[in-house]
């Protein structure tokens, strides 16, 4: 059902927000293509954008620089628009090792990946919403510029069912298999269907909790209803329903066979080229690999690495950009680029890295040249496809200022009256000892501390040293996966530890009101980690606390430091003036600590196959156990974990796995 965006919130725009919303909406309706929303941390940028979305009533794509921030934005927009389609579109790989060849050592690395089915379902839900309704907001990462199935094919393949429609059961089953649904009479899982007499049950690939029941009588659809696959209970009756393909890459049998013919033509042409260059090994390798893929496609309709033939399957010309999520957007949509100073360069970098790897594969006979067209968009191609846009950042880059041609809307005043953190400069020589005393002072007040270092080694050494001093500390580094990163941030807010150390991970979008001190070590070392925008962003992490401070440990004031300090002081001055004029007393942000992405954590409600299950855990004080007791407890828990796994109780097994990990940490500590 398509409706209007309805913003649900217990507060109304205040401070700079009303003027910013009005200006953004007016410019959008005036046809201004690019705008900049320059908003300080805690000024309500997300809420401001939500108000803009409600007023313009257009499908919206919000791009974020990483999965952590995308998850946070998804949670916030979901709360603002509970009655509308708020969707999540990020890479569905939990693990991804791309296909690669290293000529120096003659090493070929096969593609290896692990797909997160929950995120795949959310991606399918996002594209279905974009094609079927107008009140849709999709939160995405740079995954949005990577190749996807063509929307025309996706739409043409869908199965539209209406009450009273004439359709034979055999015809219905054939159509479902064309959509790549599998028949499963034992367990109705997402992307499958079952047949019981004249009743066909389908669990749509994009559905989170509800399956479709199609009741036929004498070749006619007598009843359509959504039901709970676990209990069988009917949720609601329907007049009409569209079943979309199980995957974005589904295509018709005719298109697949046509692609096989064009791939054969390309293979013949490229083999002649390789033989002409006397590359006999490469030619033999390519012929063998491609022939195997062609046989698989002809027999079963797909093969491993079928995405490398996407140009043939979509009918695109050589060099033509692949279809992406942007092709699913209507022309009048709104694009919001959050933390644009990071996201914009990221978009520009994707194509080059992908290209160099694939050129090696093509040169040495592992892939046909058409594999080069299975790629992300080039930056200029992305620009052409982008609808009217709003760049959102506390520190917009030169590109954003140039593109917006002066249309910069500022959000400097916070609704809470909070002013930007006070900045202190302290000497490097005593930075660690001084940091310890500052941390202890914050802990006494019940506050948290963020510390940013220049190198991984320094972060590790500092974490180890502070831990030895009795400080509860964690280290956030690039090897930690998305879900665990979300959990670490949540644990910091909950007070399970007091200090978080990082390198380049403490900047954009980490919303932690409990943090009152940000310490930047070696602030006078010029570089991208200590650039003006990096410093402003890092300092801003303490801006949600009334006691917010930033300490820059430096022996000299660099140009970047001076620019960051001057800009922060300009904002502080404007904020103080506004507070004085309106009689506002600053107060810290109070935000409930909740999971920003449902199903992201163990220990929260995990939705699967139409049921909500809560995994409860009894808190345990592992610190009170000695080494022998810890070893014995771990042995008992491991036996329980394996038993749960044998009984297919994987959520309980995962919970115990986490308990074992905490025991192991307690034993090492």
Curated annotation (Swiss-Prot):
Motif (Beta-hairpin): 92-115
UniProt keyword annotation of Transmembrane helix present: no
Superkingdom, taxonomy of origin: Bacteria
Name of the protein: UvrABC system protein B
Any Pfam family matching the protein: Helicase_C
Naturally occurring in which organism (per UniProt): Xylella fastidiosa (strain M23)
Domain called Helicase C-terminal: residue spans: 431-597
InterPro entries: Helicase/UvrB_N, Helicase_ATP-bd, Helicase_C-like, P-loop_NTPase, UVR_dom, UVR_dom_sf, UvrB, UvrB_inter
One annotated GO molecular function: ATP hydrolysis activity
